[in-house]
Amino acid sequence: MKKVAVLGSGQVGEVLANGFLKHGYAVMRASREPEKLAGWKSGAKGEAQTGTFADAAKWGEVIVLAVKGSAAEAALEQAGVANVAGKTVIDTTNPIADAPPQNGVIVYFTNANESLMERLQKKAPQAKLVKAFNSVGSGFMVDPKFELPPSMFICGNDAGAKAEATEILAKFGWETVDMGAVEAARPIEALCQLWCIPGFLRNDWAHAFKYMKP
């Protein structure tokens, strides 16, 4: 199993870090203030450690970017562009603005012709970014329980990295739908807005997307 670095001290980072541990991966979880993760480390089941963004990015063979969207570019800089070069970087982020939803629709700081993932890929051109885990709530990211296996839409420029992400997603209970290159992150990131609407309007957060064909 490869070593997985999870960058982020929030709920998404915790859920995914625990998911990787559950499925047998060694995990280093990272924060700007690693001491805040001491409680997580002491209770983690598996080969778990903590460190700074740079520590984790150097150590990890697969990187998971699990910070809020407004902090994503800074987190990538702190991780070190050289440290993520040539590695699969699973980008879970969405460009959510620091503003309240408008009639149930989350506000983004990007527009329809640009994605946050594209900004990140430009900042770290040698990293093999794959967009994933951004279109569902954290409670369903690992081993989701639905009537059918849900679909995770992914994209990225590197076929090998997407294959690696697909393998991880399969272990976590997901069907993967490859939507092509990094530009596809524009509509994939918008899926977060769509996913959240039933939650804001009807308090319905227990759902996921399914790609179906005849």
Language model segments and positions:
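Active-site-lining helix/loop region of Rossmann-like oxidoreductase modules
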Residues: 150-214
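General beta-strand structural signal in soluble alpha/beta enzymes
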Residues: 50, 90, 128-134, 177-179
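Nucleotide donor/acceptor-binding cores
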Residues: 2, 87, 150
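NAD(P)+-binding Rossmann beta1-loop-alpha1 motif at the extreme N-terminus of oxidoreductases
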Residues: 1-49
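Short beta-strand and adjoining strand-loop segment in the mid-core
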Residues: 103-113, 144-160
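Short, glycine-/small-residue-rich phosphate/pyrophosphate-handling segment
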Residues: 111-135, 143, 164
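Rossmann-like NAD(P)-binding element
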Residues: 41, 45-90, 94-102
